[in-house]
């Protein structure tokens, strides 16, 4: 019997085994069939044909039928295992991008095993409350996640016809956002910041306070059912990672947070898959577990620089500032994985954070990001230098979906008009401030002085607030009206007469 089974294996057929119907050997035939069939028809081929190492790339020769995006396992001479992905195929040559970096790879002694599969990540609802590295491996000393499914990290394409237009406003508790750049559930809106500005504190405050608008002032309910946060850090320092982790733990939301951390001392190339792992997890939580997921991606500038490094190693023709010409497309594959889908209650709201090099908003990274996303929140260095927190400059900030998320039935009927009037007065106030620097205060008219007074009070009372101050959208609008009462009714030209007669005469508090 054993000889016949062995002969079957040699001839390429499954071994014929007796089929026990009960006892510990039940199912042994199925197991033998599965094991033998897998490796006889599709063997995993191992190669020791590394012909060169260039930056994060490994070039292999004499590879049989390599496939684009196939996952490769590399075993180094000391037994260390690394994984990579086929980036380019040319005949029997394959270019493999190694996620953990190529340091220590010996061209003669490194063996490469082609798996025949694409990069999939294990996903489960148990990932909430856990901390992973940039490759998706647990680093919180907890057990390996028991996967409910293995999903392609590039995500599933969503039929545009099945997308739902975002219409539910998320109340962040920050007046500069809620009052003038309202965020809808399912929107993608980045924070444009720069080195040394408190963008992490703003993102943490949004995470703490985000929830749906409560229809009544009387009900104070900050709980949010089915709410989850997926946080992905790329190239951040340990201080930033620790800040977010401790903030989530202190406000008791760590059980609803999944963290992916690629630190500054981790391989650069790993940053290319970190946001995709995070978004794949978010899609599982949103569309299969039907949770409302907020995805924070920081820092997208580190991601773009990793992309430039791979492009340079492949000797591709560079675009603006050395970034690859396909960076727009590549960023879109990340940002477009936000939104809502018909037939599913879950949603994905994305808030990517990017630091503008040299505070330059025309740099390719913020420039291309602004084309793809639905607005931006602009963090301003001048406001920060004047000790205003959050230093959000509302003039270059924008939310393209604000119009559909506010108004009667969603926030309040005067919301859009108040926002427009505040924008207009603040813009004129900025012009008056610039004119005052040239001609002096004595040359200003009485109207100009009103705009100057509004400018100062707007920045001190409306924009400025505490890091733990959670204002409702109604409180934000009331503060806006207090500021607008600085002007006589006739100067408020952006607000209809009916709205003015209802809200303007209200007894004003101190402002």
Curated annotation (Swiss-Prot):
> GO cellular-component terms in the record?
apical plasma membrane; clathrin-coated vesicle membrane; cytosol; melanosome; plasma membrane; synaptic vesicle membrane; vacuolar proton-transporting V-type ATPase, V1 domain
User: What membrane topology is given?
Assistant: Peripheral membrane protein
User: Where would you find this protein in the cell?
Assistant: Apical cell membrane; Melanosome; Cytoplasm; Cytoplasmic vesicle, Clathrin-coated vesicle membrane
Which tissues is this protein detected in according to the database? Expressed in brain (at protein level). Expressed in all tissues tested, but highest in brain and in adrenal medulla.
Please give the InterPro entries that the UniProt record associates with this protein.
ATP-synt_VA_C, ATPase_a/bsu_AS, ATPase_F1/V1/A1_a/bsu_N, ATPase_F1/V1/A1_a/bsu_nucl-bd, ATPase_V1-cplx_bsu, P-loop_NTPase, V-ATPase_su_B/beta
Pfam families assigned: ATP-synt_ab, ATP-synt_ab_N, ATP-synt_VA_C
Keyword Iron, does the record have it? no
Q: Name one GO molecular function term.
A: ATP binding
Residues reported in the UniProt entry to bind ATP: 400
Q: Which SUPFAM superfamilies match?
A: P-loop containing nucleoside triphosphate hydrolases (SSF52540)
Keywords in alphabetical order, please: ATP-binding, Cell membrane, Cytoplasm, Cytoplasmic vesicle, Hydrogen ion transport, Ion transport, Membrane, Nucleotide-binding, Synapse, Transport
Reply yes or no: does the keyword Ubl conjugation apply. no
Q: Name one GO biological process term.
A: vacuolar acidification
Disulfide-bonded cysteine pairs: these are: none
Which PANTHER family does the entry mention? Answer: V-TYPE PROTON ATPASE SUBUNIT B, V-TYPE PROTON ATPASE SUBUNIT B, BRAIN ISOFORM
UniProt function note: Non-catalytic subunit of the V1 complex of vacuolar(H+)-ATPase (V-ATPase), a multisubunit enzyme composed of a peripheral complex (V1) that hydrolyzes ATP and a membrane integral complex (V0) that translocates protons. V-ATPase is responsible for acidifying and maintaining the pH of intracellular compartments and in some cell types, is targeted to the plasma membrane, where it is responsible for acidifying the extracellular environment.
* Quaternary assembly: V-ATPase is a heteromultimeric enzyme made up of two complexes: the ATP-hydrolytic V1 complex and the proton translocation V0 complex. The V1 complex consists of three catalytic AB heterodimers that form a heterohexamer, three peripheral stalks each consisting of EG heterodimers, one central rotor including subunits D and F, and the regulatory subunits C and H. The proton translocation complex V0 consists of the proton transport subunit a, a ring of proteolipid subunits c9c'', rotary subunit d, subunits e and f, and the accessory subunits ATP6AP1/Ac45 and ATP6AP2/PRR.
The family assignment reads: Belongs to the ATPase alpha/beta chains family.
Q: What is this protein called?
A: V-type proton ATPase subunit B, brain isoform
State the organism of origin: Bos taurus (Bovine)
Gene name tied to this protein? ATP6V1B2
């Amino acid at each position: 019997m054993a000889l016949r089974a062995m002969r079957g294996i040699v001839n390429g057929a499954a071994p014929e085994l007796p089929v026990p119907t009960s006892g510990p050997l039940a199912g042994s035939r199925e197991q033998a069939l599965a094991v033998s069939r897998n490796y006889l028809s599709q063997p995993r081929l191992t190669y020791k044909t590394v012909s060169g190492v260039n930056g994060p790339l490994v070039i292999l020769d004499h590879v049989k039928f390599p496939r684009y995006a196939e996952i490769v396992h590399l075993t180094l001479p000391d037994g260390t295992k690394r994984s990579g992905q086929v980036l380019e195929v040319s005949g029997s040559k394959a270019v493999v991008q190694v996620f953990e970096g190529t340091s220590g790879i010996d061209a003669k002694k490194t063996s490469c095993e082609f798996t025949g599969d694409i990069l999939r990540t294990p996903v489960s609802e148990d990932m909430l409350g856990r901390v992973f590295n940039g490759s998706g491996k647990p680093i919180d000393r907890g057990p390996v996640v028991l996967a409910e499914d293995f999903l392609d990290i590039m995500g599933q394409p969503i039929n545009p016809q099945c997308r739902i237009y975002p219409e539910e406003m998320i109340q962040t508790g920050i007046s500069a956002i809620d009052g003038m750049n309202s965020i809808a559930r399912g929107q993608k809106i980045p924070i444009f910041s720069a080195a040394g500005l408190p963008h992490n504190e703003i993102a943490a405050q949004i995470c703490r306070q985000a929830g749906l608008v409560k229809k009544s002032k009387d009900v104070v309910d900050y709980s949010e059912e089915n709410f989850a946060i997926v946080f992905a850090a790329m190239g951040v320092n340990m201080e930033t990672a620790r800040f977010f982790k401790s903030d989530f733990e202190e406000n008791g939301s760590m059980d609803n947070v999944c963290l992916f951390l690629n630190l500054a001392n981790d391989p650069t190339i790993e940053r290319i898959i970190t946001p995709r792992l995070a978004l794949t997890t978010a899609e599982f939580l949103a569309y299969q577990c039907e949770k409302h997921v907020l995805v924070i991606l920081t820092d997208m500038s580190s991601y773009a620089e990793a992309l430039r490094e791979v492009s340079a190693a492949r000797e591709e023709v560079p675009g603006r500032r050395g970034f690859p010409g396909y960076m727009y497309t590549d960023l879109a594959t990340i940002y477009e994985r936000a939104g809502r889908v018909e037939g599913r209650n879950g949603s994905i709201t994305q808030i990517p954070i990017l630091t503008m090099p040299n505070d330059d908003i025309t740099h390719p990274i913020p420039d291309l990001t602004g084309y793809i996303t639905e607005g931006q929140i602009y963090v301003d260095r001048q406001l920060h230098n004047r000790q205003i927190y959050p230093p959000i400059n509302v003039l270059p900030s924008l939310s393209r979906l604000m119009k559909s998320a506010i108004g009667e039935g969603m926030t309040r009927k005067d919301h859009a008009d108040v926002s427009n009037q505040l924008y207009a007065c603040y813009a004129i106030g900025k012009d008056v401030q610039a004119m005052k620097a040239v001609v002096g205060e004595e040359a200003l008219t009485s109207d100009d002085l009103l705009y100057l007074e509004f400018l100062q009070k707007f920045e001190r009372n409306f924009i400025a607030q505490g890091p733990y101050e959670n204002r409702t959208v109604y409180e934000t609008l009331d503060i806006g009206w207090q500021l607008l009462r600085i002007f006589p009714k006739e100067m408020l030209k952006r607000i209809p007469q009916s709205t003015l007669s209802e809200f303007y005469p209200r007894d004003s508090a101190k402002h």
